[in-house]
Amino acid sequence: MRRITKIAVALTAVSTLALTGCGRSDSDNGSGSGSASGFAADSYIGIALPQKTSENWSLAEQLFKDGLSKAGFKSDVQFANNGVSEQQNQIQTMITKGAKVIVIGAVDGGQLSSQVKAAHDAGAVVIAYDRLILNAQDVDYYVAFDNFKVGQLQGQALLDGMHAKKENGPYNVELFAGSADDSNSKVFFEGAMSVLKPKIDDGTLKIASGQKDFSQVTTQGWKAENAQKRMDALMTSNYSSATLDGILSPNDTLARAAITSVKAANKPVPVVTGQDSEVESVKSIMAGEQYSTINKDTRKLVEATMDMLTSLQKGQKAKVTDEKQYNNGVKVVPANLLEPVIVTKANAREAYSNDPTLSKVVQ
């Protein structure tokens, strides 16, 4: 059972996101709001996404376009190029055009409460996609992979990978987190630290830089250049003679940036975690460099979102699997959570057997 209370305090201090409760509600028909009477099958649906910083966002764009078209909806898929004001304007335009549902992958989950309220007042259902929208009473649903579990899987993979290379510690590690304005970043980090902190406390893990708090390890904008710059500084300051055994990286883009930095310092590549199953990182895993990634199949996430849209169109409540954990600061948002899968070289063929692209990469 998760230590939700502790995590809630940490999240509230950073972004007012709290994970409350301690357990799951596995009902398929949760208490979401909105669209009780349904809407026309050819209604306008708005999809507001952040930016194409990773392959999963680009893939989501095409999957949404194809899925909405096949279902008969009028669609509008917009990227905000990671600009908060641009996304706010895009959502407002979707409201003006009469969107029945607006699916939002937030640039900054704490900056959309006014737009969400306007959507609600106009009769639209709001679904937070992948990233929870914070401090907004009118968010109807949240659909995502279980991001706390993602962090747990990453933390355990880091320990397993280092143990496989060197049976006993202590191990020298450095920690990276995602962008502070992404509500998921803190959840990933707290999930990982629920696994790693006991090992830090008992001396199994050593952090030479001393940088172990979320605020010290974030990577603005999830940008590779920011991660590489920090990794360069860490290598120069702390690992001119010492060996770095592992790096907790929250996604594949930052993982590859960290690896590039370590190689530039002419040091052995440590165990490095990741997420998103990007092609280049899967290749790196198969080549024995990056140790792990997380398979959060974007096709399944978009499919789950489309199923929710179809239910709402018919006047039914959308599928919900959790009604306790995701408190956005002002309400518990009914969530439809999917299960992430850890991937290493050992299980890559099985994990990607049904992926038309990655199944070829791992052969």
Give the role of each language-model region.
Residues 2-6, 22-363:
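A residue-level marker of the well-folded mature domains of exported/periplasmic proteins
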Residues 10-15:
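Hydrophobic helical h-region of N-terminal Sec-dependent signal peptides
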Residues 16-21:
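C-terminal motif of bacterial Sec signal peptides marking the signal peptidase cleavage site
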